């Protein structure tokens, strides 16, 4: 079940359900998500000013509202409703998380007897996993790819932390992507050690294909690829670059990605006087990522805390040596890397 499907997903081995297409039972009639909904307060105000939706969407929502004949909504009522999920982070993220749980419960009810295990990935889906488990009685496995402590340090979002904790305690088994993550789950979330198993991430080492892109420069290229956020340590990459350039001037540094620290990093590069040696590509995906690795001489992952970090494996797949943070899960499986 995904919040937003595009319709071109490979479904040869997986049945993809678009949550936006599901009519879900909403209300306290055993939906499986009742207590989750009780924790959320939605106040609907009639207004001509509606943020972030198009006029067409507004007309559609208004038509549904008029047809329902409702002036107020109560959790003691039950009716079927279809939700539109953005599939993006936004101001109404927590509302989408709660509604996603309602949809997951409905799907679990509709597919009764057709599945054996519920597998929920990261906190956005944990309430959905809990709701599906309550409806179906099937075992719940939650997959912890990153904790709130990885993303935010000690300044955790208490709402996110609470959802993570609830999901892991409700689960029959917790999968951690590294022993580093496993220890955080035990010590910070109070999850019993015997409940958690470590399964490291991996990449498929397929034969490299396609023409190697022309570099256009003779300088060595050092690459950072990932979200430009606190967790990924982009500022350490910049400071290290400044030190390298004092000793070896014919090096270029590439920061491939986007994130909330991007403007801060750009300003820091300018203040250090190394802008002529720095390149910002923006967010890369698919084949562009592969090309970036092909153009690189060294890949650096300076993460402050990295639950796993699959990009060094992707770099090594392109025969690029890597320098990685010791505070990473991938450091547990890489013997041939500078740490």
Label each residue range with its predicted role.
Residues 2-108:
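A conserved catalytic-core segment of Leloir-type glycosyltransferases
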Residues 97-103, 136-141, 149-166, 205:
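Nucleotide-sugar donor phosphate/pyrophosphate-binding loop at the beta->alpha transition
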Residues 175, 215-241, 254:
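Conserved donor-binding/catalytic core segment of Leloir-type glycosyltransferases
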Residues 180, 202:
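Carbohydrate-associated surface elements
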Residues 264-284:
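Nucleotide-activated donor-binding/catalytic signature segment of Leloir-type glycosyltransferases, i.e.
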Residues 283-284, 291-296:
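Short alpha-helical donor nucleotide-sugar binding micro-motif in glycosyltransferases
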Residues 304:
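Aromatic "clamp/platform" in nucleotide-sugar-dependent glycosyltransferases that forms part
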Residues 321-324:
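Short hydrophobic beta-strand element within catalytic cores of glycosyltransferases
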């Amino acid at each position: 079940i995904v919040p937003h499907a595009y319709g071109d997903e490979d479904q040869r081995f997986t049945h993809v359900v678009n949550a936006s297409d599901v009519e879900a039972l909403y209300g306290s009639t055993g939906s499986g998500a009742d207590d989750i909904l009780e924790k959320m307060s939605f106040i609907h105000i009639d207004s001509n000013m509606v943020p972030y939706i198009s006029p067409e969407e507004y007309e559609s929502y208004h038509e549904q509202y008029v047809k329902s004949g409702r002036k107020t909504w109560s959790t003691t009522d039950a009716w079927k409703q279809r939700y539109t999920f953005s599939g993006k982070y936004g101001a109404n993220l927590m509302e989408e998380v709660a509604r996603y749980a309602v949809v997951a419960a409905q799907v679990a009810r509709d597919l009764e007897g057709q599945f054996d295990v519920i597998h929920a990935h990261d906190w956005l889906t944990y309430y959905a996993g809990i709701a599906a488990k309550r409806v179906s009685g099937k075992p719940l496995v939650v997959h912890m790819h990153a904790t709130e402590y990885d993303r935010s340090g000690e300044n955790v979002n208490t709402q996110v932390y609470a959802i993570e904790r609830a999901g892991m305690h409700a689960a029959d088994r917790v999968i951690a992507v590294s022993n580093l993550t496993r220890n955080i789950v035990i010590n910070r979330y109070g999850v019993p050690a015997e409940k958690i198993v470590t399964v490291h991430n991996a990449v498929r080492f397929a034969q490299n294909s396609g023409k190697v892109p022309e570099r256009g420069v003779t300088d060595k290229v050092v690459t950072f690829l990932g979200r430009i956020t606190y967790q990924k340590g982009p500022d350490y990459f910049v400071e290290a670059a400044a030190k390298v350039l004092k000793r070896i001037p014919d090096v270029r540094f590439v920061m491939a990605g986007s994130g909330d620290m991007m403007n801060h990093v750009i300003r820091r590069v300018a203040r250090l006087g190394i802008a002529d040696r720095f390149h910002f590509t923006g967010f890369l995906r698919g084949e562009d990522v592969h090309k970036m690795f092909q153009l690189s001489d060294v890949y650096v992952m300076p993460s402050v805390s990295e639950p796993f970090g699959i990009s060094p494996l992707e770099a090594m797949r392109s025969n690029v040596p890597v320098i990685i943070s010791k505070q990473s899960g991938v450091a547990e499986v890489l013997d041939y890397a500078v740490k």
